Amino acid sequence: MSVVYKKKKRNVVVGVVYIHATYNNIIVTVTDQQGHSLICTSAGACSFKGSKKATPYAAQETASHAVKTVVEQNGMKTVSIKVSGPGAGREAAIRAVQACNLNVTSIKDTTKLPHNGCKLPGRRRV
């Protein structure tokens, strides 16, 4: 007979929502203050496929799904938001987190910008 281990539910009141928006997808990760991941989801995991993953609607649905799951399981009440990437769903994901009745303490843009680093790839020739 096999033994099934159930993950212990932790009561996490304060957390961090990381939103990584690229041109092709959006990834939302919710962690506690120490950085331990509570849930990680993407637009592809929320049944958006192909070019629909890069839309603001997909970002909104992905962010709201992640936050609602954490609120139900862990009782989170306060979050800070960290956004990175140049994608189209940045603002929609932030609004979706704010609409989930959470106290948002800060919104920070952590997009990395090169100070003239590597050479960009050449333009596509079709």
From Swiss-Prot:
<keyword id="KW-0689">Ribosomal protein</keyword>
<comment type="subunit">
    <text>Part of the 30S ribosomal subunit. Interacts with proteins S7 and S18. Binds to IF-3.</text>
</comment>
<comment type="function">
    <text>Located on the platform of the 30S subunit, it bridges several disparate RNA helices of the 16S rRNA. Forms part of the Shine-Dalgarno cleft in the 70S ribosome.</text>
</comment>
<dbReference type="GO" id="GO:0005840">
    <property type="term" value="C:ribosome"/>
</dbReference>
<keyword id="KW-0687">Ribonucleoprotein</keyword>
<protein>
    <recommendedName>
        <fullName>Small ribosomal subunit protein uS11</fullName>
    </recommendedName>
</protein>
<keyword id="KW-0694">RNA-binding</keyword>
<dbReference type="GO" id="GO:0006412">
    <property type="term" value="P:translation"/>
</dbReference>
<dbReference type="GO" id="GO:1990904">
    <property type="term" value="C:ribonucleoprotein complex"/>
</dbReference>
<dbReference type="Pfam" id="PF00411">
    <property type="entry name" value="Ribosomal_S11"/>
</dbReference>
<dbReference type="InterPro" id="IPR036967">
    <property type="entry name" value="Ribosomal_uS11_sf"/>
</dbReference>
<dbReference type="GO" id="GO:0003735">
    <property type="term" value="F:structural constituent of ribosome"/>
</dbReference>
<dbReference type="GO" id="GO:0019843">
    <property type="term" value="F:rRNA binding"/>
</dbReference>
<comment type="similarity">
    <text>Belongs to the universal ribosomal protein uS11 family.</text>
</comment>
<dbReference type="InterPro" id="IPR001971">
    <property type="entry name" value="Ribosomal_uS11"/>
</dbReference>
<dbReference type="InterPro" id="IPR019981">
    <property type="entry name" value="Ribosomal_uS11_bac-type"/>
</dbReference>
<keyword id="KW-0699">rRNA-binding</keyword>
